[in-house]
Amino acid sequence: MQRRIFLKNGTLAIAGLVLTRQLSAMTAAEPQTYYFKDDGNIPNSQFPLLVYKNVFSHRGQKGGDWLEQRFAENGWTNTWRWGVYPFHHYHSTSHEVLGCFSGEAVLQLGGESGKKMKVQAGDIIVIPAGVGHKCITHSSDFTVLGAYPFDLSPDLMKGEKGERPAADSRIAKLKLPDTDPLTGTMSGLTKIWKK
């Protein structure tokens, strides 16, 4: 009987420690910020793109499930699982979050003159409406979970002639999210994205 109680209490203590470490890592996570200027084709944004590096440990299906639950808890829904388009594009009807739960890739962020960045499982990227993104190269297992605030659906803009100024107008009218997809109301975009 004593051994059973000891094992039960020990298991609960370990589970509590793991959960505490995961939560403290998420709340302590400070995103990297990247600003991109309008390049004439891709509008980009006054708000920075946010990159959380290696902020969750789940991989594969469990990682996708964890991200979907975490994002939904923080009001980011309408999810999908796939890769990133191999051409420059942006969204004018919603902000977007991408959580990588499998593989790795090199993305170009901010349009033709933007930044090339390696992303891998464990990384989360919060993309303001208007910011260009494209996949340059990826591993065969590269997969992200995408989601949007307010259950919005994104359009697909490619920086082509005739998209603007209508796309700029839609972006300007978008409400800022109430929560960060990873940290909720504690930090992240709620502290960084200010009008």
Language model features by range: what are they?
Residues 1-5, 15-29:
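N-terminal twin-arginine translocation
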Residues 30-56, 60:
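Non-heme Fe(II)/2-oxoglutarate
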Residues 72-91:
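Conserved short histidine dyad/triad with adjacent acidic residue
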Residues 93-106:
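Short, conserved beta-strand element in jelly-roll/cupin
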Residues 119-138:
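Conserved metal-binding segment of the jelly-roll/cupin
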Residues 136-195:
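Double-stranded beta-helix
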